């Protein structure tokens, strides 16, 4: 297929048009008074959202060069959301402002490479000032404030996230699911839970709840399939002398072994339950080791030279309480040594840092949570499917932003942090590097101006008023008042501001230093020709029919 090439100003102007259109659609969602955007879907009802990245993801433009510009900035919004959970609209507004200012200067003759260098130096200096101005998240109240702002000022969501983080800790896993009703709920699972239930309902101790509960129990862990009773008989006799319940976690228990266990359980000879080991393949082995560390036991594996026939009671794990239903097993109050658990947690954290697979990272984080904190499930309720999807997106974003705040700290919100940081930056640059520096200094005012405009105020007036002051002074767009942002709880995670600025400068630099674009030429589909009617002339002979 033939391709068209655009050069220099012609290419950059078309790229800018794409960025402008994306920016104009996304910017209206910014701030506490941001507006909704209605998005048509290929099937089903249209979706309504105030989430900038959701709007950006839907945008495809008809002009191929303009579309390339839009797609690059869309990528910035997505990457900002992935890394920090929030700040997608901030990144888009910054990218547009930097590109607009930069394009004006480059068209007037500035050197794009020198301009880029100045922009990079200015951004780095502002980020350093942001870090100096940040403070660690103090407690539950500040976590609630961050989560509330990221959830588009929904205080109920903010409180749920703060409650969840308080209960499972910073290493715990918090997942978001759809509730069956319209109310939001929080479920917290204490201890380690994995998705394997009892192998036989005859192990149940509570017929009403259909659960098996074992108190002060031993836990046998093996990666072997148990099919013969003689494999585990010596160990069963030893545990019977201790008079404690036993949970068997094995690859599988079948045939004679399972039947014998059930019969002895029903006769009251053994207080026992059996479940399959969680996970598959190598992950199963690692999860068995996790349970062993948590309970102070040892995985009986032939790889380690251990067999069930020769296993001793010392190899068994111990737990204060074990609850098993038909789908899940929960181990509470494992008796493992705390230093062993800490070592295992550190090992998993190292694996998380080094893995490149999102799936592996998610599974490792689940294992980390089960060992160190726990698992909380936020169940989001809504009256309609459209509202449910929009609300679930907001909760996901708020959760990521809250984790970012705990990780790197917080700064004043409402677009004021960037202005405060810029006020403290004074770089002695020359020529076109200075032009790049000044571009950033002007562009960082754009987020605050846009928040004010969306709330119905004059952006320029608000920016000037904020610039006159120092410290935590900023603009509360919810009520139009100038306040101490920290005292009012108007805060942003440092990570969100940092990544939004870094990504915006990165994509703007790429666009400003673009000298040519290559795209396919859309071929017009030819209109099908009318069929040849020449053969109809023979119909003249039909006159003889009169």
Swiss-Prot record:
Catalytic class of the enzyme: isomerase
One GO cellular component term: cytoplasm
Keyword ATP-binding: yes
GO molecular function terms noted in the UniProt entry: ATP binding; ATP-dependent protein folding chaperone; isomerase activity; unfolded protein binding
Entry's EC annotation: 5.6.1.7
GO process annotations (BP): protein refolding
Disulfide bond positions: none
Record-linked PROSITE patterns: CHAPERONINS_CPN60
Claim: Chaperone is one of the keywords in the record: yes
Compartments, as annotated in UniProt: Cytoplasm
Matching InterPro entries: Chaperonin_Cpn60_CS (IPR018370), Cpn60/GroEL (IPR001844), Cpn60/GroEL/TCP-1 (IPR002423), GroEL-like_apical_dom_sf (IPR027409), GROEL-like_equatorial_sf (IPR027413), TCP-1-like_intermed_sf (IPR027410)
Keywords, in A-Z order: ATP-binding, Chaperone, Cytoplasm, Isomerase, Nucleotide-binding
Coiled-coil ranges from the UniProt annotation: none
Binding-site positions, ATP: 29-32, 50, 86-90, 414, 492
Pfam families found in the cross-reference section: Cpn60_TCP1
Reaction(s) catalysed by this chain's protein: ATP + H2O + a folded polypeptide = ADP + phosphate + an unfolded polypeptide
Task of the protein: Together with its co-chaperonin GroES, plays an essential role in assisting protein folding. The GroEL-GroES system forms a nano-cage that allows encapsulation of the non-native substrate proteins and provides a physical environment optimized to promote and accelerate protein folding.
UniProt-listed NCBIfam families: GroEL (TIGR02348), PRK00013.1 (NF000592), PRK12849.1 (NF009487), PRK12850.1 (NF009488), PRK12851.1 (NF009489)
Family that this chain belongs to: Belongs to the chaperonin (HSP60) family.
PANTHER family: 60 KDA HEAT SHOCK PROTEIN, MITOCHONDRIAL (PTHR45633)
Oligomeric and partner information: Forms a cylinder of 14 subunits composed of two heptameric rings stacked back-to-back. Interacts with the co-chaperonin GroES.
Full protein name: Chaperonin GroEL
Organism: Helicobacter pylori (strain Shi470)
Designated gene of the protein: groEL
